[in-house]
Amino acid sequence: MAATDLERFSNAEPEPRSLSLGGHVGFDSLPDQLVSKSVTQGFSFNILCVGETGIGKSTLMNTLFNTTFETEEASHHEECVRLRPQTYDLQESNVQLKLTIVDAVGFGDQINKDESYRPIVDYIDAQFENYLQEELKIRRSLFDYHDTRIHVCLYFITPTGHSLKSLDLVTMKKLDSKVNIIPIIAKADTISKSELHKFKIKIMGELVSNGVQIYQFPTDDEAVAEINAVMNAHLPFAVVGSTEEVKVGNKLVRARQYPWGVVQVENENHCDFVKLREMLIRVNMEDLREQTHSRHYELYRRCKLEEMGFQDSDGDSQPFSLQETYEAKRKEFLSELQRKEEEMRQMFVNKVKETELELKEKERELHEKFEHLKRLHQEEKRKVEEKRRELEEETNAFNRRKAAVEALQSQALHATSQQPLRKDKDKKKASGWSSIYSVTIP
């Protein structure tokens, strides 16, 4: 026998033996214990309502749970889609239910609807992430944890009677791997029965052709297999919601009053509201919770753990222990860290070299600029010296001309000052001669 066969034989688990009991033991009360524990703990159920503003989401929720939830009026002028969760504590008989209704406010109201699904996907992933973080805690308390994971998405389809909008197809395609989708035709009393039947066939055909996976009521449980198989053929449900009571015959029923007649909400000949309530709440609520945990959440959890480096086995199907996974991830991280450090060091060295080259280039440019300025300075200095010498020569020449002019002026002044003296002397001589002549002549 080969070594691999021996290992396979040694690792194989032995078949359990069936034994008969000699008397009553008591573990047949386990189902009762489980029921008692579940009733004590209570249940949580989270519904996501996706549909255009004013399509009747709040009214249908009030009708489904036969109460009035306090909700705010939604506007048609929302800039983007936002998720508005509201939690309520309900009790029926001795069963407590923590119900969370999440409304996609503003869905389909924007001009650009390309990313309308994004806030919805992000919200669903955020609830998965919160649950995963709670699971990964060393001291976790899932018993007291309020599970906010979306268990079902009621997708409200506008009753156009023609086909699905591209927004509906894109959104459901993005959501089908993350949540259980139950498509419903809202305000089904606005189209005729024949149009409604054709519309249902058209919707299911488009969902199948576009690969959209909606929630199928399970048929593996014999207790509900028959009714679920029948209800699967009625999808999508055409519903009418109303909290008003109208008197029909001798009793009051929830209905919508029109001039042409009355549409009874709980009359299966008028709409599929009763079918939706039975499938969603009475028959398949626990399966929706289970599908959310075992299918959608497990897919999210697996992808997240694989991103973190965890895996069940290697290529040879050998299981990894947590310690082995941790050590492998640690080595991978250290090698990546070392590689990053080497890259950063090399980048630093290259940056230093580039900086040195830039500094040398700047130094060379500055030196050339300095030499250029130095030459300009010397040239300017030479020109200034030449100008100074020319100025000195002109000054000396001016001084010489000035001295010559001053000499001429002094000579002229001296000459002009001598002429009056001569005139005085001549006058005196003339007067002397005249007096002499006057004396001698009687």
From Swiss-Prot:
Its main location: cytoplasm. The modification N-acetylalanine is found at A2. GO terms for molecular function: GTP binding; GTPase activity; molecular adaptor activity. It comes from the Eukaryota. Residues 1-22, 379-442 are annotated as: Disordered. Residues 103-106 are annotated as: G3 motif. GTP binds at residues 51-58, 106, 187-195, 241, 256. Gene3D superfamilies: P-loop containing nucleotide triphosphate hydrolases. CDD domains: CDC_Septin. Keywords: Acetylation, Cell projection, Coiled coil, Cytoplasm, Cytoplasmic vesicle, Cytoskeleton, GTP-binding, Membrane, Nucleotide-binding, Phosphoprotein, Synapse. GO terms for biological process: cytoskeleton-dependent cytokinesis; protein localization; regulation of intracellular protein transport; regulation of protein stability; regulation of SNARE complex assembly. This is Septin-8.
